[in-house]
Amino acid sequence: MKQENLTQECCSTSPKISKGLMVLQSIASRGCDTQDSEKKPQSTQQSLKKSSQAAAGYFYDKEDQIRKLSKHNGFLSEMEDMRKAFLMRPGCPQFSTRTTSMSHVGSAIMVDLPRTCSGVWKLTEDHPLGRLGSASSVDGRVFPFSKSACELNYPRKRSEPSDPSPTGSPTVVKKSQRTRTPWYISVIHEKDHSLLLMGEELQRFSEMESQMQKKDQEILTLQKEKEALKKQLKNLLRGKGTETSSASIKMDRSFETPLKLGRMSVLKTIYKEEDELQHWMQMQEEYSMAESSKELHVEPGSAIEEKSSEGPPEEAAAAKLSRPSQSKTETLLEVGPEEEEEEEEEEVEGDEAKGTEEGEILVNEEEASWELREDEECHPKRSYSMTESFEEELMAQLEEYERMLMDFQRELEFTRSRYSLATGTITSLQRQTDFQESQLRKVTTENELLEKELRERKQQIQDMTDKFSNLREEKKHQEIMGLIEKENLVLRQQVADLKMDLISSERTIKELNTQTKELEDQVNTDKDHLRRWKDLHDDLQTRNEIIQQTEQQTRVVLEATQARYEKLRNKIIQAVFSVSGNKNLSMELSDSYILESLQRIISERSDFYSQLKQKGVKVPPLQQSDVSLPSKIKKMASK
């Protein structure tokens, strides 16, 4: 139930993922069939390297462990199995979920994945050169390879030695079990290979971007050409009026120049004829004056009237000839700028105006010729010869004007034909611009489609890379978490040991601190004792010196007392021997006897001394030794 709920949630949240899963299942079924048919001949032909064998055995064991662990994982286990089947199919495009036709971009070339993996990452081997464009199924049908984004223009890696499946040889499995390489080496190789593939993919995308930039430049050039053609069309559409106006102006100018020349020639001839007429009239006047003098009534000023009558018709004819030409030029000059500003309808009106102007010119010329004829008829008969020659010249000029009109008509027809040709070229240019616009639209649509495909391919690549990276990262995360937990336990034990060591070291430090304090106290006491001993020593030295001094003094006193004692002894001996009642020398004298005698002497002396004092005789005082001597003698006697 949980698996069904997970699949339903995934399908409802991401329809693209569900479609991709369906495609993966179909491709996996195709890949498994083709792989079983190709496994036996490939396993006998190829051999494993030591590192690949070790990695294959390790990952084979890991696969069994993962299968045991992922039996009850539901949707994740299904995704893992489908990913394995997807990677095991022949001609696997690594980062695509759907098959798209890219025949217009380039031929499909296989992308090789690393072959050192176990059944989880195991792929089919390289196909021979004849099978680069198709993959055959079990039935013998030829499947076209999926020309996805990652298969375009990749160089085929034929130098890599292909490895058979690890189940092919049991000795290889034993060797791989003995020498197992760490799991991260194959992961690093796989990452390097995927990075290389991504680099090639980026190079291909950069080439496609350069192609897109070139196409954008071509589109810009086509747009510029289109704008230039539009400008040419506008100029041509505007130039219709300008060409017709310029052609009419040229025609008018070419028409006006012979008119002006003819007018000038007519005027010159008129002026010459007027001079000749004046000269002839003067001659006639002189002749008439001569005749009038001969004859009776000659009217004065007849010549002047004839001159005036002949002159004005000629001037009128010239004016009449000049007026239509001036009116024509004025109308043409008026029509010209109007035709420049207006478009095709105004051009048609300009052509009609030209026809009306030409008709007016012809009518004016005919009227001028009739007026000249009438004027000539009005002339007197005597100027008939001159007017006849003048009429002939005018007729010749009229014939020239008719010829010029015919030429102008021909030129008009020529300009009409040119106008029709110009309209034809304009229509052809319009068709060309339409064709180029259609090509531009096609190119823009193709570019948009290519950009959409590029975006889709990039999104597909990103989705597949995210899927595979998430799946791989989950496994790696679990393994890393286990390693981290083990390392944490080891670190905790180490921390506990270090704490115990710390406690013991702290205890020893405390003991040592107490010992150092005691030793410091002892040192201080010893220092005090030493100081006291030094003081005592100094005192003793001073006392010793004092004692030595006193000893010397006592020695001196002793020697003096000894000397005095000797003297006293001698005196005592003399006194003893001289005292009455002395005994014989043959008898020995005892100490008591000597003491008694001494006391007697001393007492007598002291009595004598006191008597002398009583009498008032100045006597020196007795010495202390003399006074203290009987007490000492008593002490000695008591001892």
UniProtKB/Swiss-Prot annotation:
Q: Where is the composition biased (Low complexity)?
A: 310-320
Superkingdom of this protein's organism: Eukaryota
| Keyword hit for Coiled coil | yes
Q: Does the keyword RNA-binding apply?
A: no
Which residue windows does the record flag with biased composition (Acidic residues)?
336-350, 358-369
The entry's keywords: Coiled coil
Taking the record's annotation, the residue ranges forming a coiled coil are 203-242
* Region Disordered, annotated ranges: 154-176, 291-385
* Composition bias type Basic and acidic residues, residue spans: 292-309, 370-380
Protein name in UniProt? Coiled-coil domain-containing protein 27
Whichever gene encodes this chain, its name is: Ccdc27
